[in-house]
């Protein structure tokens, strides 16, 4: 049986960040990463962008193959970990191979959530989560003219824009009463909707896909209210669910995700978890930046450190052609809103305050002050102090 000091299951950004941090703190300890995918860690957050671009797989890699060799990190690809033997500190792969470990990191990531829609298994309905998905979707789209997007969140809109760049007719179906409900208030979301409509997008709000139409192959969608949309391709962007199959029937505690403490430790002494698979403080974030930071903390702690992970404030940037958006912090629990508007230039900025401190912001158009405002949200700057430097806000 092969043995290693550090075993990482998964090679997403959390797994890679952990491996980097382990090697920074332990130059000699053996590190093995195992992944069911056929590619080294890549920029998953760029997949939607590359729907409308020609590229090589290597362009998407976070670190090239030579980096792993230089750092003496062994990566096992195209293998699935089928079982964790917590008592004997070993895992079993789908080919029967066993690997023993001293410290284990679970970084198995997440999978797309496909809502329970009648006919959802028809050819032509897909979700974009992996590089393999991207290659399949790009090929399938070559024969599509009308494509529908189920989900009007951030990733959904980015995908919709990529589809428009491929000269597709694009419909966006959103269950909520307005787009980006987590990042925007209704007033600014309405402005975004207007802009998207001007670019030719068809938008269906407060809408739910009830049935995928077609005889084995997608031809359309039936919405609530008996409305129908013709579609020869459907991309679902309805969120994620942690990959818990490996740990579900072990002693590792899990709920919506693998439950960890502020050190990214599970309830089992030598087992850690990080990334999309993790639940911390009752939350599953599913964010690239969070996965990166969690991986760093977990990796360092696997070498004996006692670092703490702090939940980040959420920042969102969306740039699609002439459309520019930035959202930061808390926008749904505040005392007052301070605004700056320039209708001629189509700019609308809002600062949300609580107890006279800036707790959140939304910028629509002109993002030059984005970093300044981001820092003000992070530090909860006094609105009075901020206005002294930026008198646009009232």
Predicted regions and their residues:
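Rossmann-like NAD(P)H-binding beta-loop-alpha module
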Residues: 136-184, 218
